[in-house]
């Protein structure tokens, strides 16, 4: 088997690289063992959130000039980095990944996303179902109703409430029981975000959940829900927002990440649509060298069949 480029790894960096190369006319193969960093994604993307000394960054591109010379961004250079940054929203849009609208200005600003522990973390871009606050001082609302599924332990409502109350939002925690989700509780291993999200793909299920949230509201101006909706159809999250008479904020759970897996699937689809070959559930186990250059690799599933390429890209997080 001969390709122009073989990419080892199936996460964000490998998929972005593979899509760009495939669209540029290269013949690409991607080898992915399966789970990758997108399965742990927050649904937000960072460019430069903090300086090496821990200082928060407000304007990432402006802060690049203060980085040490050995930093990758310094080596790329601000001008080229700016060009890459400008192309990101369009790239994701072409792949079907919807982001918050970005103003076409020379200066880009970081916002803050709410983590699964209720803390704030700098972020540059976010999927359109992830809430970004303009600053650390911004309150999400005056009164928040935090709603979880009964028995779902991967959404820590207490931590979220503590974090929000420190910033001046009064919080009340409630849980909802749905027959369809209760079936998952028979096996604790099944009570995970992705499995709940699959149940919530059904119109009857997410509508029933939204109706129960409506009944729980008691003067709150914001409702906080676990990010376990829109696994197949992200528009479901918008429909839920339209049904609930308060501002609705989705906050990520502990992994696996529903928005992350959704993004990985969309990027994989875009890579294959561009003509790329994707080996899922396989891994590179051996390499043959021509001098200091990798000439071919062997994978676990292909036995003695070697894969040759002009270039190999290692994007496996190792």
Residue ranges, per PLM feature:
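N-terminal Rossmann-like FAD-binding beta1-loop-alpha1 element of flavoenzymes
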Residues: 3-30
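Short hydrophobic core segments
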Residues: 6-8, 31, 284, 307-317
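Short, well-ordered coil/turn residues at beta-beta hairpins
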Residues: 9, 147-150, 226-227, 300, ...
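Conserved N-terminal glycine-rich FAD pyrophosphate-binding loop of Rossmann-like flavoproteins
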Residues: 33-69, 180-196
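Dinucleotide-binding Rossmann-like beta1-alpha1 core, especially the glycine-rich loop
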Residues: 47-133, 138, 144-145, 149-152, ...
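Helix-loop-beta segment of a Rossmann-like dinucleotide-binding subdomain
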Residues: 70-73, 131-152, 172-176, 182-195, ...
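Helical element adjacent to the flavin cofactor pocket in flavoenzyme catalytic cores
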Residues: 155, 159-167, 200-218, 222, ...
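Conserved beta-strand-loop-beta-strand element in the redox core of flavoprotein oxidoreductases
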Residues: 268, 285-306, 312
